[in-house]
Amino acid sequence: MNCKNMDTSYEIINYLTKDELDIDLSCMDKKERYKIWKRLPKCELHCHLDVCFSVDFFLNVIRKYNIQPNMSDEEIIDYYLFSKPGKSLDEFVEKALRLTDIYIDYTVVEDLAKHAVFNKYKEGVVLMEFRYSPSFMSFKHNLDKDLIHEAIVKGLNEAVALLEYKIQVGLLCTGDGGLSHERMKEAAEFCIKHKKDFVGYDHAGHEVDLKPFKDIFDNIREEGISLSVHAGEDVSIPNLNSLYTAINLLHVKRIGHGIRVSESQELIDLVKEKDILLEVCPISNVLLNNVKSMDTHPIRMLYDAGVKVSVNSDDPGMFLTNITDNYEELYTHLNFTLADFMKMNLWAVQKSFVDPDIKNKIISKYF
């Protein structure tokens, strides 16, 4: 696959306005509701660009580069992707590492970035923050991290221009150093080196208490880079220390996932006091077995308690889902309304790390 051969046509989306939020969804079938979810002007803050692709894109790369010549399409999907509930985040990480097979050259990386922007526009996203991990994308085929970054920025910018700026895109750098101070520092230095292209910094991978790395996060923040780390996602961890560290020591503006805030009234009060938004990824939480079912997802309780939350797809390529699937699940299982969703998306725009002028224009146009 090559960018020059990619379908860059697009349709104009007739977005919902504030005056159209009383649409009766109850009389619609699923197909009709999906048309509404698409028309809802959305801001997505938590999506890993590394795994933001359609099945067709993924299989095209696998076949073009002859990566798994002895597997059928079904076997490839089962081997690499995570379309049904698993046992844990660890199981997901194991599969995600296999995915690095596809980051075989810089053309694939650029194509992936461009493809992701077009897909998000087609889902009705007006403001999109992608994040990616330089180390994750580079290690399997020993690609140069700076050239990976160059390819991603080029792909994103070209796609936004081809879409005539009907979608705005920001980029976060993700560090995933685990408990290695050296790897964490290396990721932070990469982010600072390319800070003109990044709007924020994130830590992902296995959830850990980041207290030992406070100095690294302080350095990033002092460079004017906003912070959002994964915390309060993994229910197998016996404490909530990652959340307290993120809030009280790292001074994050947002938290990736953060659903375990619901387990503590003190944490609920704390995120409200500090005006921290939780980047909630509903389908991801269920598939990774951090929430037993969508009916019991804590986003409903958090929203009702006055905590700012947003709706996100996390790893849509891995999950064979997209952002509109998450809205459908929240409507079907937790009775969220269009007005609720509009409020969440306004919060997301307000808490986005992109330039304030971009945010103000989007708020004025859609909210």
Curated annotation (Swiss-Prot):
Pathway: Purine metabolism; purine nucleoside salvage
Documented activity regulation: Inhibited by coformycin and methylthiocoformycin (MT-coformycin).
Binding site for a purine D-ribonucleoside: H48, L49, D50, D176, G205, E233, H257, D314
Entries under PROSITE patterns matching the protein: A_DEAMINASE (PS00485)
Cofactor names: Zn(2+)
UniProt source species: Plasmodium falciparum (isolate 3D7)
Any one biological process term the GO annotation gives: adenosine catabolic process
Region (Gating helix loop): 174-188
Gene expressing this chain: ADA
Keyword tags: Hydrolase, Metal-binding, Purine salvage, Zinc
Name assigned to this protein: Adenosine deaminase
Source domain of life: Eukaryota
One GO molecular-function entry: metal ion binding
EC nos: 3.5.4.4, 3.5.4.31
Top-level class of the enzyme under EC nomenclature: hydrolase
Record text on cofactor binding: Binds 1 zinc ion per subunit.
Important for substrate specificity for S-methyl-5'-thioadenosine, annotated site positions: D176
Binding site for Zn(2+): H46, H48, H230, D314
Catalysis performed (reactions): adenosine + H2O + H(+) = inosine + NH4(+); S-methyl-5'-thioadenosine + H2O + H(+) = S-methyl-5'-thioinosine + NH4(+)
Family stated for the protein in its record: Belongs to the metallo-dependent hydrolases superfamily. Adenosine and AMP deaminases family.
PANTHER family: ADENOSINE DEAMINASE
Gene3D superfamilies, alphabetized: Metal-dependent hydrolases
GO CC aspect terms: cytosol; external side of plasma membrane
Protein's job: Catalyzes the hydrolytic deamination of adenosine to produce inosine. Unlike mammalian adenosine deaminases, also catalyzes the deamination of 5'-methylthioadenosine (MTA), a by-product of polyamine biosynthesis, to produce 5'-methylthioinosine (MTI). Plays an essential role in the purine salvage pathway which allows the parasite to use host cell purines for the synthesis of nucleic acids.
